[in-house]
Amino acid sequence: MLLLVMTLAVFMPVSANAAPKTNQWVNKGGYRYYYNQKGKKVKNKVKQIGKFRYSFDKKGRMQTGWQIFGSKKAYFSKKSGRMQVNKKVNGVKIGKSGYVKRSKTELKEQKVLEKAKQIL
């Protein structure tokens, strides 16, 4: 029996890569990532994970602070990354949806800032 176990241990292929990460958080290189049920990083979206929503950029990095989505903006906790709901952050009211509707003036200002960034 011992000989069988030793033989199997020698001839069993061992993968250098760890098993795929599924439905879990991974901290790597100072960033936080979430791998979905298929083992792929969640990228470029707001995703509900458990009871909370989180924002991920195009590389799959969890985003914190104020994030802008078209005409809406949302705040994600600097500590946990969770989308804040039914709160006031920096004097701005956030409703139960988690989003703050932006005024036309804010949208125009944002467009000007985006153009300025392209020039610089």
Descriptions of predicted regions:
Residues 1-119:
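Extracellular adhesion/carbohydrate-binding repeat motifs centered on closely spaced tryptophans
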